[in-house]
Amino acid sequence: MSVFFYLFVLVFGLQATIHCAPHNSSEGKVTTCHLPQQNATLYKMPSINADFAFSLYRRLSVENPDLNIFFSPVSISVALAMLSFGSGSSTQTQILEVLGFNLTDTPVTELQQGFQHLICSLNFPKNELELQMGNAVFIGQQLKPLAKFLDDVKTLYETEVFSTDFSNVSAAQHKINSYVEKQTKGKIVGLIQGLKLNIIMILVNYIHFRAQWANPFRVSKTEESSNFSVDKSTTVQVPMMHQLEQYYHYVDMELNCTVLQMDYSENALALFVLPKEGHMEWVEAAMSSKTLKKWNYLLQKGWVELFVPKFSISATYDLGSTLQKMGMRDAFAESADFPGITEDSGLKLSYAFHKAVLHIGEEGTKEGASPEVGSLDQQEVPPLHPVIRLDRAFLLMILEKRTRSVLFLGKLVNPTKQ
């Protein structure tokens, strides 16, 4: 059976020059999910979050041309929403507008309830799927956060809060990195390097996802060396997994791409989008929540001979400049307003650091063995069936079915570049 790991860490640094008493915090966790009553925002959130994901993707694609792209949209949305509820005036308005929300027709209370339910639903225990999202706030010992802020981040965001001595830079850096390494089960080590002085608060957001294909690949069918076209003049060799199976798929003649859905064993799916050669930018520009809904409606199940590269991908971004270009300017400026976090002035966002890691392949069960599955009854397979080879740049998405959340979004340009 196939095992996949998807890991994400987002770090925000807030800077200020303040003097106040230290505060000790305790841990709090949400243990049950309650569906908010009469909350229209809850039902709009999947579409709004998806549109934010594609807007951010397009920015990252422009800033990183011809490179692999990979990030966790839902985790970034959660972290920014958490930050917005501690902000005020234009700082809050800009953060929420970047996320796609308008406070004129969307009450803050509904947003809080919506994100609380999203986090709780994603973290709700599942039998064959490991999915855990979490947050941690590392607060300088000299900062006195408001009691309401501490209560909200625990209740709404299942957040751990740690009092931290940022005057001892190396010790603070070690404390944060150790936490991240533990929460990501050792997959992200030494996330923060060269931590600077005058950091007052750091928000860490992570997501861990591990699942098995509903129809696992056979290791013996993997081609150890197969061509993958990076561009017109560059071809690399990659292991190529191979399977003849029934998949939901669709050829979008309007967008000139082929869409294929691969289900995980429980409540999650992977969506691969293969544009025709020369049409990647066209597809990227058209990606939206409406596009996802269209594909979901038009996907048809049938036999497909599928070739998928076995690859690892990781990407690291400083989202500060990207978010500012998207309209979130005040949070990084001297005019930043965070009255919901502390009564002290001078608090502003210094950077937004994001890292995501993905491995996809047929490595096997948790013990590392990948059992062979029985042969297909060839009489069931029609003599004519489509062949889909993901042997050039393609888009990939990992979606959680219950909340319709885009957990991960990316583009594989070169599978040999991690």
From Swiss-Prot:
Gene3D superfamilies, per database record: Alpha-1-antitrypsin, domain 1, Antithrombin, subunit I, domain 2, Serpins superfamily
Glycosylation sites noted in the Swiss-Prot or TrEMBL record: N24, N39, N102, N168, N227, N256
Intracellular or extracellular location(s): Secreted
Keyword Hydrolase among record annotations: no
Signal peptide: 1-20
CDD domains found in the cross-reference section: serpinA7_TBG (cd19555)
SMART domains cross-referenced by the UniProt entry: SERPIN
Main location as per UniProt: secreted
Role played: Major thyroid hormone transport protein in serum.
Protein name: Thyroxine-binding globulin
Lineage: Eukaryota, Metazoa, Chordata, Craniata, Vertebrata
